UniProtKB/Swiss-Prot annotation:
Catalytic activity from the UniProt record: a plastoquinone + NADH + (n+1) H(+)(in) = a plastoquinol + NAD(+) + n H(+)(out); a plastoquinone + NADPH + (n+1) H(+)(in) = a plastoquinol + NADP(+) + n H(+)(out)
Subcellular location: Plastid, Chloroplast thylakoid membrane
Signal peptide positions (record): none
GO biological process: aerobic respiration; ATP synthesis coupled electron transport; electron transport coupled proton transport
Membrane topology: Multi-pass membrane protein
UniProt protein name: NAD(P)H-quinone oxidoreductase chain 4, chloroplastic
Keywords from the UniProt entry: Chloroplast, Membrane, NAD, NADP, Plastid, Plastoquinone, Quinone, Thylakoid, Translocase, Transmembrane, Transmembrane helix
Family to which the UniProt record says this protein belongs: Belongs to the complex I subunit 4 family.
Length: 500
C-alpha cells in the first residue's frame, strides 16, 4: 500500500503547471507548445508509474486512497481513490489529452489561454474519475464546463457562440438536477451531512426517494453521454469546435456521463437501477437506430461523425442496463474503444477541413489523390468505427451483445427483439460511414476549392494517428488487456444485484 499522494499530484499538477503558462516569455507560441506537451507527458508518466507499481489489479477494493479535511465547517473532505472502473478512464484521459495538445499546434491566437484551458480540463477529468466524495465529484463535473465553453466560443467556427451557448445551457440545466440529487443523498438519513461514497454505498432509501434521486442523476448524465432526446448540443458543438477540442469532447467528456451512470446510479442506487434497466436497454437500442439514421441524412461530415458518436453511445447504455458481468465489461470496453476511435475521426475530419475549407459532402470528391495518407487513416478508423473484426469496436460491441443475451433480467422475446434492433443499427453504421468515404475521397477531383494547394499529413499528424491506431488494433486482438482492469471490480459491483 502506498501512502504517497499520487492522485492529488495527478489532479493538481496540470492546472497548477498550466497557470504558469502566462509567465512564459511572449516569443511566438513555440515555448508554450513544448511546455504544455512536457506537462502532459510528465503527468502521463507519473500516472503510468503509479498504476504499474502501486495498484493491484486482483484487488477489487478502492486503492491509492487519500482522505484529508478540506472545508472544516461543512465537514467536506478531499477524498480520492481508484479502482478497476476508473483506472481505464484515467489512462484514456492522459493518453488522449497528451495527443490533443499535440494536435493543437496550429493554434496561434491566444495560445497561452488555449493551452491553459486544455490543462484545466485535464485536471477536472482526472479529478472526476478519482473522486471518492460525491460533492467533490460534482465540483469536478462542473469544472469542465468553463474551459469547454471558452474553447468553443473563442476558437470555434462561424456559429461558435450559438453552439457554445447551447452546450452551456444543456449541461448547466443537467447540473441542477445533479446538485439536487447530491444534496438529497447528503441530507437524507443522518444528522451530519456526509457525501463519502463508502458510506453512501451502504445507505438505503425509501423506494420513491431512490427513484427520484436516480432520475435526477440520470438527466445530468443523459446530457453528457448523451442520451436522446438530450443529444442535440453534440452535433452543433462538434460542427463548430476546433478539432483538438473535439478530441477531448468525443474522447473523454462523453465518457464522464457513462462513468457517472456506473459509479453513482449503479453503485449507490441499485434498487432503482434494477427498475430502470429495461428502459435503459430500450433507449439504447432506439438510440443506435435513430442516431445512425440521422447521421445518414447529414450533409456536414463533422455532424455525420457526431451522430455516429451518439449511435455508439447506445451500446454503452445497453451494456449498463443489462446488469451482467459481460454486459458491463463490454460497456467499459466500448467507453475506451470509442474514446480512441471517436477522437481520431474528429481529428481527421478537422485536419481535412482545415486544408479544403469545405465541410459539405456534396462539394467534396476525389481527395484521395492529393491526400493519400489522410485517406488511408480515415478509411482505417472508419473501419474500426463500423466494428471490423480485429479492431476494438468489434470486440466491444460483440461483448455487449453477449451481455444482453445472457442477462437473466430479460425474457427471451424482448432480448431477441432488442438484439434484432441492435443488429439493424450495426448494418446502418457501414452505410453512413462508407457513403461518407465515397463522397469525400472517391469520384472526380475537386476543382472549385477555396484552397487548392492543400498538402497531405505531416510527420506530427502521422505520429499522432499511429499512436492511437496501435491501441485500437491491440484491444481488438487482445481485449483481455483492458478487461483485466475492470473484471474483478465489476463482479464485486454486480454482487449487490443478486444478493439484495
Amino acid at each position: 500500500m502506498s501512502y504517497f499522494p499520487w492522485l492529488t499530484i495527478l489532479v493538481v499538477l496540470p492546472i497548477f503547471a498550466g497557470s504558469l503558462i502566462f509567465f512564459l516569455p511572449h516569443k511566438g507560441n513555440k515555448i508554450v507548445r513544448w511546455y504544455t506537451i512536457a506537462i502532459c507527458l510528465l503527468e502521463f508518466l507519473i500516472m503510468t508509474y503509479a498504476f504499474c507499481y502501486h495498484f493491484q489489479l486482483e484487488d477489487p477494493l478502492i486503492q491509492l486512497k487519500e482522505d484529508s479535511k478540506w472545508i472544516d465547517v461543512f465537514d467536506f473532505h478531499w477524498r480520492l481513490g481508484i479502482d478497476g472502473l476508473s483506472l481505464g478512464s484515467i489512462l484514456l484521459t492522459g493518453f488522449i489529452t497528451t495527443l490533443a495538445t499535440l494536435a493543437a499546434w496550429p493554434v496561434t491566437r491566444n495560445s497561452q489561454l488555449f493551452y491553459f484551458l486544455m490543462l484545466a480540463m485535464y485536471s477536472g477529468q482526472i479529478g472526476l474519475f478519482s473522486s471518492r466524495d460525491l460533492l467533490l465529484f460534482f465540483i469536478m463535473w462542473e469544472l469542465e464546463l468553463i474551459p469547454v465553453y471558452l474553447l468553443l466560443s473563442m476558437w470555434g467556427g462561424k456559429r461558435r457562440l450559438y453552439s457554445a451557448t447551447k452546450f452551456i445551457l444543456y449541461t448547466a440545466g443537467g447540473s441542477i438536477f445533479f446538485l439536487i440529487g447530491v444534496l438529497g443523498m447528503g441530507l437524507y438519513g443522518s444528522n451530519e451531512p456526509g457525501l463519502d461514497l463508502e458510506r453512501l454505498i451502504n445507505q438505503s432509501y425509501p423506494t420513491t426517494l431512490e427513484i427520484l434521486l436516480y432520475f435526477g442523476f440520470l438527466i445530468a448524465y443523459a446530457v453528457k453521454l448523451p442520451i436522446i432526446p438530450l443529444h442535440t448540443w453534440l452535433p452543433d458543438t462538434h460542427g463548430e469546435a476546433h478539432y483538438s477540442t473535439c478530441m477531448l469532447l468525443a474522447g473523454i467528456l462523453l465518457k464522464m456521463g457513462a462513468y457517472g451512470l456506473i459509479r453513482v446510479n449503479m453503485e449507490l442506487l441499485p434498487h432503482a437501477h434494477y427498475l430502470f434497466s429495461p428502459w435503459l436497454v430500450i433507449i439504447g437500442a432506439v438510440q443506435i437506430i435513430y442516431a445512425a439514421s440521422t447521421s445518414l441524412g447529414q450533409r456536414n461530415f463533422k455532424k455525420r461523425i457526431a451522430y455516429s458518436s451518439v449511435s455508439h453511445m447506445g451500446f454503452i447504455i445497453i451494456g449498463i442496463g443489462s446488469i451482467t458481468n459481460i454486459g458491463l465489461n463490454g460497456a467499459i470496453l466500448q467507453i475506451l474503444s470509442h474514446g480512441f476511435i471517436g477522437a481520431t475521426l474528429f481529428f481527421l475530419a478537422g485536419t481535412a477541413c482545415d486544408r479544403m475549407r469545405l465541410v459539405y459532402l456534396e462539394e467534396l470528391g476525389g481527395i484521395s489523390i492529393p491526400m493519400p495518407k489522410i485517406f488511408t487513416m480515415f478509411s482505417s478508423f472508419s473501419m474500426a468505427s463500423l466494428a471490423l473484426p480485429g479492431m476494438s469496436g468489434f470486440v466491444a460491441e460483440l461483448v455487449v451483445f453477449f451481455g444482453l443475451i445472457t442477462s437473466p433480467k430479460f425474457m427471451l422475446m424482448p432480448k431477441m427483439l432488442i438484439t434484432f434492433v441492435m443488429a439493424i443499427g450495426m448494418i446502418l453504421t457501414p452505410i453512413y460511414l462508407l457513403s461518407m468515404l465515397r463522397q469525400m475521397f472517391y469520384g472526380y477531383k475537386l476543382f472549385h476549392v477555396p484552397n487548392k494547394n492543400f498538402v497531405d499529413s505531416g510527420p506530427r499528424e502521422l505520429f499522432l494517428l499511429i499512436c492511437i491506431f496501435l491501441p485500437v488494433i491491440g484491444i481488438g486482438i487482445y481485449p483481455d488487456f483492458v478487461l483485466s482492469l475492470s473484471v474483478d471490480r465489476v463482479e464485486a459491483l454486480l454482487s449487490n444485484y443478486y444478493t439484495k
